[in-house]
């Protein structure tokens, strides 16, 4: 394994602990921040006849999440009303969804999206898979804590009652947030062993030893698995993604594919999800909003770069073509610029 590859691996999203999370975010803390002034301006905007949506969008999309929490606190102190409730009364449609998402902490937002994906008849497997496959240990542990706080039940219990079979086992294992962290020592012997076991458990035999796949893909560190998937190609005639498509079907196939794509290149994974949400006729606004809100302070700059590289046009351009009005304005602010 080349030194360059090892350095790049150490800089992967999960393992780069030296870089502040906001370094690749499009939304930065506002420099001359004044929570009281912002709260007053939002109060005035809500009271304006017809609602001054532009002011609300300008403020909330140009403040960090921590700053938005301060604004919400200042607003409640001023008006004796909760800001999310005021937003629900003042706004509607997709713009309301974006603004309410921005007012939640990242863990509250993910917890509420997970709950919504399992509420009522039918399960939104896509949302469930995206969130659980893409969050780090730390994020998942915080989501579990906040989920219990918000809904008085465990996330794991809800996943168990809403899913079944091997798909359920994979999600439950991932949701624990117990994956090994990236270490400084690279265990080439274990990399080779895991690659061989993934091959032996799938393509090499008749039927698939899914529990073996689950244990390796949910317990090993991201950096380790990146190397395992590379090594896997020396055993199998197919790469890991092709092997998954041959071996399993349905929700389980979808979950494994999402998981491997996240491990290989998380910003590219989100770039693909964003492209899929806007391609063709109609827009999958729920996916578009969730990614723009949840990644704006994490890795939006990397996502933009991968998007432009793969699709030839900027994410900003796609959003401009696919959305309109103040909803469009909000998403473009979260995007943080054209490429």
Curated annotation (Swiss-Prot):
One GO term describing the cellular component: nucleus
Record-listed N6-acetyllysine modification sites: 49, 152, 227
UniProt keywords, alphabetically: Acetylation, Annexin, Basement membrane, Calcium, Calcium/phospholipid-binding, Extracellular matrix, Isopeptide bond, Phosphoprotein, Repeat, Secreted, Ubl conjugation
Region of interest: S100A10-binding site: 2-24
Keyword set includes DNA repair: no
Positions of post-translational Phosphotyrosine modification: 24, 199
N-acetylserine PTM sites in chain numbering: 2
Top-level taxon of origin: Eukaryota
Cross-link (Glycyl lysine isopeptide (Lys-Gly) (interchain with G-Cter in SUMO2)): 49
Protein function: Calcium-regulated membrane-binding protein whose affinity for calcium is greatly enhanced by anionic phospholipids. It binds two calcium ions with high affinity. May be involved in heat-stress response. Inhibits PCSK9-enhanced LDLR degradation, probably reduces PCSK9 protein levels via a translational mechanism but also competes with LDLR for binding with PCSK9. Binds to endosomes damaged by phagocytosis of particulate wear debris and participates in endosomal membrane stabilization, thereby limiting NLRP3 inflammasome activation.
Miscellaneous comment: It may cross-link plasma membrane phospholipids with actin and the cytoskeleton and be involved with exocytosis.
Domain notes: A pair of annexin repeats may form one binding site for calcium and phospholipid.
Family: Belongs to the annexin family.
Subunit composition and interactions: Heterotetramer containing 2 light chains of S100A10/p11 and 2 heavy chains of ANXA2/p36. Interacts with ATP1B1. Interacts with DYSF. Interacts with COCH. Interacts (via repeat Annexin 1) with PCSK9 (via the C-terminal domain); the interaction inhibits the degradation of LDLR. Interacts with CEACAM1 (via the cytoplasmic domain); this interaction is regulated by phosphorylation of CEACAM1. Interacts with APPL2 and APPL1; targets APPL2 to endosomes and acting in parallel to RAB5A. Interacts with S100A4. May interact with UBAP2.
Name of the molecule in the record: Annexin A2
Origin species: Rattus norvegicus
Gene from which the chain derives: Anxa2
């Amino acid at each position: 394994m080349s030194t360059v590859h090892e350095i790049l691996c150490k800089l992967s999203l999960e393992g780069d602990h030296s870089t502040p999370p906001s370094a690749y975010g499009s939304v930065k803390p506002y420099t001359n921040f004044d929570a009281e002034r912002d709260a007053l301006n939002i109060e005035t905007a809500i009271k304006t006849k017809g609602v001054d949506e532009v002011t609300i969008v300008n403020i909330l999309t140009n403040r960090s999440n921590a700053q938005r929490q301060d604004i919400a606190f200042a607003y409640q102190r001023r008006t004796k009303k909760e800001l999310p409730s005021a937003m629900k009364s003042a706004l509607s449609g997709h713009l309301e969804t974006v603004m309410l998402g921005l007012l939640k902490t990242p863990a509250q937002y993910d917890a509420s999206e997970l709950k919504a994906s399992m509420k009522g008849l039918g399960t939104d497997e896509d949302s469930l898979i995206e969130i659980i496959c893409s969050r780090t240990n730390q994020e998942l542990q915080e989501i579990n804590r906040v989920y219990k706080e918000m809904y008085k039940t465990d996330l794991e219990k809800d996943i168990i009652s809403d899913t079944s079979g091997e798909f359920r086992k994979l999600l439950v294992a991932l949701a624990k947030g117990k994956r090994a962290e990236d270490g400084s020592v690279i265990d080439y012997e274990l990399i080779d062993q895991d690659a061989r076991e993934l091959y032996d458990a799938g393509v090499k035999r008749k039927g698939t030893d899914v529990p073996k796949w689950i244990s390796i893909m949910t317990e090993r560190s991201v950096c380790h698995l990146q190397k395992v998937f590379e090594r896997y190609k020396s055993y199998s005639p197919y790469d890991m993604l092709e092997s998954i498509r041959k071996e399993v079907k349905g929700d389980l196939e979808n979950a494994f594919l999402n998981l491997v794509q996240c491990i290989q290149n998380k910003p590219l994974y989100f770039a693909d999800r964003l492209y899929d949400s806007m391609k063709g006729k109609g827009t999958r606004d729920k996916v578009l909003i969730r990614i723009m809100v949840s990644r704006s302070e994490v890795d939006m700059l990397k996502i933009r770069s991968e998007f432009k590289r793969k699709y030839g046009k900027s994410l900003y351009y796609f959003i401009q073509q696919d959305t309109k009005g103040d909803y469009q304005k909000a998403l473009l602010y979260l995007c943080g610029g054209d490429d």
